[in-house]
């Protein structure tokens, strides 16, 4: 259960009429604050040691699960290696793996405060993870926030070729099976565009957001008690019968 937040976030278009994206600075990363932020179209993004910055970009990057098509290369990889895929089994391991330095930089925006805030949000039932395993080793995954039918992607990681893409494809199938209209990808980048993402105006995103967050949430229990095979997913293009 999420208690009411002690913070009130400003309306993004009023706080940022020029569309620069930064809405406000401050507050904390308690679950109630994160919940309040996401339901108003904001997310935290800041460097470790800096004040907490809350963003609502113009435009907003989203991807539509119903329109997503995995690449032929990804399908071949899923059939070749047959990894195991789970949901909500190792949320903290996933977010900590996402926080590790990448090959191209030693910096990370996923601070210990971010980790603790989202772990608590997960415990409250408003965050999710998708894990990719090779036997007992976690080799890829992603995490995000889920409120109603609102699905918000946060970060992903990969220790083997394509394992973050396998997690992403799995999330798209979850979205298809639960009538999730879009997955919020926040900021536009070339990698997301290559996966099929597109942009919405901030106004259109905020209007849609208010509709989706009041819808029945994703039924994660139907997935998290099972272990899925990447080979079977690639063959069937679905998770449940």
UniProtKB/Swiss-Prot annotation:
EC class of the enzyme, as a word: transferase
Family: Belongs to the L/F-transferase family.
Gene3D superfamilies cross-referenced by the UniProt entry: Leucyl/phenylalanyl-tRNA-protein transferase, C-terminal domain (3.40.630.70), Leucyl/phenylalanyl-tRNA-protein transferase, N-terminal domain (3.30.70.3550)
Disulphide bonds in the chain: none
Catalytic activity, as annotated: N-terminal L-lysyl-[protein] + L-leucyl-tRNA(Leu) = N-terminal L-leucyl-L-lysyl-[protein] + tRNA(Leu) + H(+); N-terminal L-arginyl-[protein] + L-leucyl-tRNA(Leu) = N-terminal L-leucyl-L-arginyl-[protein] + tRNA(Leu) + H(+); L-phenylalanyl-tRNA(Phe) + an N-terminal L-alpha-aminoacyl-[protein] = an N-terminal L-phenylalanyl-L-alpha-aminoacyl-[protein] + tRNA(Phe)
One Pfam family hit: Leu_Phe_trans
Localization in the cell: Cytoplasm
Keyword Acyltransferase part of the UniProt annotation: yes
EC number: 2.3.2.6
Lineage of the organism: Bacteria, Pseudomonadati, Pseudomonadota, Gammaproteobacteria, Moraxellales
GO terms of molecular function: leucyl-tRNA--protein transferase activity
NCBIfam families: aat
Protein name: Leucyl/phenylalanyl-tRNA--protein transferase
Source organism, top-level taxon: Bacteria
A cellular component term, taken from the record's GO annotations: cytoplasm
Function: Functions in the N-end rule pathway of protein degradation where it conjugates Leu, Phe and, less efficiently, Met from aminoacyl-tRNAs to the N-termini of proteins containing an N-terminal arginine or lysine.
Keywords in alphabetical order: Acyltransferase, Cytoplasm, Transferase
GO terms for biological process, alphabetical: protein catabolic process
């Amino acid at each position: 259960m999420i208690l009411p937040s002690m913070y009130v976030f400003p309306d993004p278009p009023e706080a940022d009429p020029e569309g620069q994206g930064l809405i406000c600075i401050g507050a904390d990363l308690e679950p109630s604050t994160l919940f309040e932020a996401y339901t108003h179209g904001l997310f935290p993004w800041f460097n470790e040691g800096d004040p907490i910055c809350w963003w609502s970009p113009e435009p907003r990057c989203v991807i539509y699960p119903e329109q997503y098509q995995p690449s032929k290369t990804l399908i071949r990889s899923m059939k070749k290696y047959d990894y195991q895929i789970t949901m909500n089994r190792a949320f903290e391991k996933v977010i900590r793996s996402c926080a590790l330095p990448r090959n191209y930089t030693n910096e990370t925006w996923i601070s210990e405060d971010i980790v603790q805030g989202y772990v608590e949000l997960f415990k409250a039932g408003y965050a999710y993870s998708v894990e990719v395993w090779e036997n007992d080793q976690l080799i890829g995954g992603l995490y995000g926030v889920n409120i109603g039918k609102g699905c918000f992607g946060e970060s992903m990681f990969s220790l083997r070729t394509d394992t973050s893409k396998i997690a992403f494809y799995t999330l798209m199938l979850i979205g298809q099976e639960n009538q999730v209209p879009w997955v919020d990808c926040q900021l536009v980048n070339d990698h997301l565009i290559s996966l099929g993402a597109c942009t919405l105006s901030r106004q259109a995103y905020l209007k849609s957001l208010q509709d989706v967050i009041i819808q029945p949430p994703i039924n994660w229990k139907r997935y998290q008690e099972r272990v899925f095979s990447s080979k079977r997913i690639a063959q069937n293009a679905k998770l449940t019968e």
